[in-house]
């Protein structure tokens, strides 16, 4: 919230006062206004020892103050704010012939607030190098409660509308896009030529209407790639109000009388609006913005979204003391009005997202320095623990996959060894078959003939003794054939039918036969079978161990999952607690702001009460002095009588 800035300007006196003394106290008469410290005005009674009413404002200017000084003190900050996106309003209020139009428009040698503001807007916009501006101007007057466009000749009466996008606006009002201050000055000359002026007893060129010069300032970032920036749209209102009039002083009649009635009516409604806005929030009733077109158009500047400055002009002469007192009372009430000014932006989706991120970052910064730092540390620790558990879970998963591959390899090796064992058992032969095959191979000779398929030879069992003919004792006396016949029991065989056969040991024993049947390869096969069986047993044991290790890893993985879930729950709870703390902190700050506002309102009420008490005390003192003077006069009159 921001208070309206209020200043009072006394014009130079029109009576025969010395030129070197332009203060309000130089006007002569029984009552005069005195300026103290450029912030306080006091009504002095020359015949009373106690001063009268006293008023305090942000600034008080005497007749020697120039338009440039008033602009620099009161309005220049509004121009900078308007360029930055804030709405701004400056208007002059006071009785007729008190210097309002001179303050706002000025002259060729002493430009007023409007031309100074126009030039300052363009100068300030040029200083902002990172934004580009589009400026539109309009000029309107409120004459007899009718709105006229001063930039269009013979324009029809314009209505007032309101919408969520534009707020309160005048429909059909002409807006000119301008690029320089000189272009604006030409439009101002056109508007002044179409404005209503008239002559009264108090002012030769009296304003008969309220005028509002409006500048709409739009700006956007020059870097169009920065989509996060918003478009700023601000409205600057520079208002020259017509002065309040007393018919007895102005001598108005006919058209001037009608104009004066409408002027006084709109100013009275403006005073009612200011009076309502200056009251306490709980006691404030309906604010009559709609009772006048002036207050309807100025609604954003009166208790709304705008920075507002009011220049109250006053006449220092004693003849205008009551009008000046009314002006100062209006200014005192206006000083109690607060506005809520904020930057006017049109946000795109990207700009809105950027703004929300900035607000989140600001909330994080606000949380620093409070006990929420503990929660931040807890959240950070839980995040680290969760990260460690995730790394451990990944490591266990990798080990589990490695164990699974190892188990598959062992199972494959075990299957291959089992197949080898099965093949060996299927292809094994008996010892007798093995011995016969060896003997058969050894019986073959180079001159031996192939036996026919139907030829079957049988050999006597080795368990029986081999039968043979007795060897003759005297071999020398026996012929060869006779010897052969004797050896073969009288059988004589054709020698050509015989085949060469190798020699055999005669009558081998069973033990020797078994020894001759045994092969050197039989023992390594048994040893190989035993080795393979041992390998299978070892592989089975290793497979069982791997299964047990896998079960342990899966159990550890489940435990880590449960711990991870509990950490996530704790993190969510901590975040929820942090959100609650943020909400509580914001609520406490809001309550603190409300208490500060109440304290300020209470201080203002005490101040107003003190002023009213001082005023009442001054009135009582003045009444006492007058009564005492009357009594003294009566006594003197009685003594003078014979």
Swiss-Prot record:
The keyword Disulfide bond does not apply. Residues 3-337 form the Kinesin motor domain. GO terms for biological process: microtubule-based movement. One of its GO terms (molecular function) is ATP binding. Residues 343-428, 540-612 form a coiled coil. Residues 12-27 have a biased composition (Low complexity). The keyword Signal does not apply. ATP binds at residues 94-101. Residues 12-33 are annotated as: Disordered. Keywords: ATP-binding, Coiled coil, Microtubule, Motor protein, Nucleotide-binding. Transmembrane segments: none annotated. One of its GO terms (cellular component) is microtubule. Belongs to the TRAFAC class myosin-kinesin ATPase superfamily. Kinesin family. KIN-7 subfamily. This is Kinesin-like protein KIN-7L. It comes from Oryza sativa subsp. japonica. The gene is KIN7L.
